[in-house]
């Protein structure tokens, strides 16, 4: 059984094949670079309370 596995690109939602795709899980280099740019700009965040600002001292520093 040689079923072709297809997935949706996480960026543009276009159907793409998994096997033989050098940009997987993305459909193209463009979508891969858009996602990388979002990571670099800290566009992906976990929801929650903002972390307190550090005063430059780490716990245990005396």
Swiss-Prot record:
Q: Which GO terms describe its molecular function?
A: zinc ion binding
Q: Please list the residues that bind Zn(2+).
A: 9, 12, 27, 31
Q: Which Gene3D superfamilies match?
A: Erythroid Transcription Factor GATA-1, subunit A
**Which Pfam families does this chain map to?**
YacG
Q: Which cofactor does it need?
A: Zn(2+)
Free-text function comment from the UniProt entry: Inhibits all the catalytic activities of DNA gyrase by preventing its interaction with DNA. Acts by binding directly to the C-terminal domain of GyrB, which probably disrupts DNA binding by the gyrase.
- Which named protein is this? DNA gyrase inhibitor YacG
**Which organism's genome codes for this protein?**
Geobacter sp. (strain M21)
């Amino acid at each position: 059984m040689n079923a072709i596995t297809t997935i949706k690109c996480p960026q543009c939602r276009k159907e793409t094949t998994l096997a033989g795709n050098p940009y997987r899980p993305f459909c193209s280099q463009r979508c891969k670079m858009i996602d990388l740019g979002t990571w670099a700009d800290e566009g992906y965040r976990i929801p929650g309370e903002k972390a307190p600002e550090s005063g430059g001292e780490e716990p245990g520093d005396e």
